[in-house]
Structures are given as structure tokens and as C-alpha cells.
Regions:
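Flexible, solvent-exposed loop/hinge segments and secondary-structure transition points
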Residues: 20-148, 152-156, 160-177
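Bacterial N-terminal signal peptides
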Residues: 7-16
Length: 177
């Protein structure tokens, strides 16, 4: 009987060691909306990217589109609120981007961070680098986006995600003139 218990304990310990040590929800969707667009009214929209739009976004941004269904809200008076996910090193990072009426980044908020390390991507100074960026901006580490030592993959993947969302705005959301 004792031997059986020991054999059950070892797999349980190993399973616990492979689980992420930290998963933190910082903001709900409503809290992120309030942080980016205080006092504004937002209307959730149902938008699904077509196959052609997905291909064009991938070609333009250089980033794979994982989901065709967009999580987007249109802001009364102009602008967009978009919730997206990217992979950090091993786990998803959920973030929100607010875009102005002309498609510039208004603000970036990290909503859920599930990695053990690299939470510095939540630092306001680092996130401020994205403000004003539009479609066509490089959004590359050590170029127009400063890398965070110890959070390189999270930094890179968030920059890639924002670049993809800017391409999504340009190719699928921007009002036609």
C-alpha cells in the first residue's frame, strides 16, 4: 500500500511542476474599455474575417491570423476597441488595443498575463511606445519598440500582435472613402 501511494505522489508533483506558476487577470473587458475609452459608449460588433482578408493581413503584417472571429467594439464618435491574444513564451497573453478614429494606437492594456516571467510588459512606459503607431509602423524589437530583458518573447509577440491588429484595421475595419 505504501509503495502505491509513493507512485501516485511522484506524478502529482511532476504535474504541478509543469503548470504555470503565475496566472493573473489584471483587467476585465469592461475595465480595459474604461481605461482606454473613459466615458465613451462602445458597441460590440460581430465580424468574421474572410479567407482573403486573413491572407492579406498575414501578408501585410507578417503575422499569422489565428482566429477569423474578431472581438471588437466600435466607439461612438470614432475609434475601435479590440481584444486579442498572443503567445508569450508558453502561455497566452490577453490584451486590448484602443484605436483612434484614424487607426492610430490610443492605448495598449495587458488584461491577462499567464507567464511566470516577463510581466514587465504591463509597465506603462513600455506600453506607451505603441501610442500613435499606425499601419505601416515596423513595430520591431530594438527598432521602434524597446525590448525588455527577461521578457523578450512576450515583448516581441505583443508587438507582432499590435502590428497584426493595425493591418486588420487597415484591411478589414477602416471605413472606405
Amino acid at each position: 500500500m505504501r509503495t502505491t501511494i509513493h507512485w501516485m505522489v511522484v506524478p502529482a508533483l511532476v504535474a504541478g511542476a509543469t503548470c504555470p506558476a503565475r496566472a493573473v487577470t489584471y483587467l476585465s473587458i469592461e475595465q480595459a474599455q474604461q481605461a482606454i475609452f473613459p466615458q465613451a459608449r462602445l458597441h460590440q460588433l460581430e465580424r468574421t474575417l474572410t479567407s482573403d482578408q486573413r491572407k492579406a493581413i498575414e501578408k501585410t503584417s507578417g503575422v499569422k491570423v489565428r482566429a477569423a472571429q474578431l472581438k471588437i467594439w466600435q466607439v461612438e464618435g470614432g475609434g475601435w476597441f479590440i481584444v486579442d491574444e498572443v503567445i508569450g513564451k508558453h502561455e497566452f497573453i490577453t490584451y486590448a488595443v484602443g484605436l483612434t478614429a484614424d487607426g492610430a494606437v490610443k492605448q495598449l492594456e495587458v488584461m491577462d498575463y499567464r507567464e511566470t516571467y516577463g510581466g514587465q510588459v504591463r509597465d506603462e512606459k513600455w506600453r506607451a511606445q505603441f501610442i500613435g503607431k499606425k499601419h505601416g509602423a515596423k513595430l520591431k524589437l530594438d527598432d521602434d519598440i524597446q525590448n525588455i530583458s527577461g521578457a523578450t518573447l512576450s515583448s516581441r509577440h505583443l508587438a507582432d500582435g499590435v502590428r497584426r491588429l493595425l493591418a486588420t484595421y487597415e484591411l478589414a475595419l477602416k471605413p472606405k472613402a
